[in-house]
Swiss-Prot record:
PROSITE patterns: CYSTATIN_FETUIN_A, FETUIN_1, FETUIN_2
GO BP terms in the entry: acute-phase response; negative regulation of bone mineralization; positive regulation of phagocytosis; regulation of inflammatory response
Family in the record: Belongs to the fetuin family.
Keyword Secreted: yes
Secretion signal, residue range per the UniProt entry: 1-15
Protein's name according to its UniProt entry: Alpha-2-HS-glycoprotein
UniProt cross-references to PANTHER family, sorted A to Z: ALPHA-2-HS-GLYCOPROTEIN (PTHR13814:SF6), FETUIN (PTHR13814)
SMART domains membership: CY
Glycan-modified residues: 99, 156, 176, 301, 339
UniProt key word Repeat: yes
GO molecular function: cysteine-type endopeptidase inhibitor activity
Example of a GO cellular component annotation carried by this entry: blood microparticle
Gene3D superfamilies listed in its UniProt record: 3.10.450.10
Length: 364
């Protein structure tokens, strides 16, 4: 009898290690820092960075909440809310995210907020749904930390556009290889001391030689795309003229990848998605002369949408507006229902809900 009681107690202890399913609400609530929860969140961040057409990569900062729903016939879906922070790596930069630095608060940091559904099936995580938005830290908070730190400037500001153009012209003048075109202006700030414009922008190589270019409009992007990322500064001299400094990092060329065509599509038919909507094509600089183009992930495709003209950063909502991804088309559709207003089930000891999770960097 004692042996039976001992076995019974051991069984109860083992069962306490698993997260109970709420028999009324129909979901589990693991801790936000649970390993599987974190893996689901990291899978979502990876998905976000792979589908961003412009701007900078984001990294996980905090998991705010999580519910795990069963999914028929197999698997389970993590319904997670996460906070992200912008890094200093551009989306075209092949540097692994783990090696990318988080942009600090004194540099006018940008935070993202995402609601995501991630399917876990056979030990693999795949993203079903992503809805995000992002915003820079408030000017007041930046000023509290650093009164003299520059704030983000509108990317279509005439001084910003001029700074990007002269910085790129300076780079091309110093370059003995390909002529580079502007892909996008990614970030800009007005620096008070010394009075200057700081600008960051992405570029792409063309089939022209930099030293021989007469008409840049006749230059075409290379079939095997080569991108670069530049940082420039333009200081207006008191007696006229400018001091221009620029440094560019060029990335390895990207091989041509055949794009799958829809059934029945003609070989020469134009794509429904403009080249400017995807990362492997040059887009015009965001200036007052032409409305910038963004994109929304809609299932297996990327759909072009207009961007706000006076934006200072690339808002995640312009890509992740809450459209289910292609993975959700397989198997039974998953719909998160409204959470019933019920008490917690009578689980011995009561479940411990450790949410929100730890902050990996800082809150803004």
């Amino acid at each position: 009898m004692k042996s039976f009681l001992l076995l019974f107690c051991l069984a109860q202890l083992c069962s306490c290690r698993s997260i109970p399913l709420d028999p009324i609400a129909g979901y589990k609530e693991p801790a936000c820092d649970d390993p599987d929860t974190e893996q689901a969140a990291l899978a979502a961040v990876d998905y976000i960075n792979k589908h961003l057409p412009r701007g900078y990569k984001h990294t996980l900062n905090q998991i705010d909440s999580v519910k795990v729903w069963p999914r028929r016939p197999t698997g389970e879906v993590y319904d997670i809310e996460i906070d992200t922070l912008e890094t200093t790596c551009h989306v075209l930069d092949p540097t692994p995210l783990v090696n990318c630095s988080v942009r600090q608060q004194t540099e006018h940091a940008v935070e993202g907020d995402c609601d995501i559904h991630v399917l876990k099936q056979d030990g693999q995580f795949s993203v079903l749904f992503t809805k995000c938005d992002s915003s820079p830290d408030s000017a007041e908070d930046v000023r509290k930390l650093c009164p003299d730190c520059p704030l983000l400037a509108p990317l279509n500001n005439s001084q910003v556009v001029h700074a990007a153009e002269v910085a790129l012209a300076t780079f091309n003048a110093q370059n003995n290889g390909s002529y580079f075109q502007l892909v996008e202006i990614s970030r800009a700030q007005f620096v008070p001391l010394p009075g200057s414009v700081s600008v960051e922008f992405a570029v792409a190589a063309t089939d022209c030689i930099a030293k021989e270019v007469v008409d840049p409009t006749k230059c075409n992007l290379l079939a095997e795309k080569q991108y670069g990322f530049c940082k420039g500064s333009v200081i207006q001299k008191a007696l006229g003229g400018e001091d221009v400094t620029v440094t560019c990092t060029l990335f390895q060329t990207q091989p041509v990848i055949p794009q799958p065509q829809p059934e029945g599509a003609e070989a020469g038919a134009p794509s429904a998605v403009p080249d400017a909507a995807v990362p492997d094509a040059a887009v015009p600089a965001p200036s007052a002369a032409g409305l910038p183009v963004g994109s929304v992930v809609a299932g297996p495709s990327v759909v072009a949408v207009p961007l706000p003209l006076h934006r200072a950063h690339y808002d995640l909502r312009h890509t992740f507006s809450g459209v289910a991804s292609v993975e959700s088309a397989s198997g039974e559709a998953f719909h998160v229902g409204k959470t019933p207003i019920v008490g917690q089930p009578s689980v011995p000891g009561g479940p411990v809900h450790l949410c929100p999770g730890r902050i990996r960097y800082f809150k803004i």
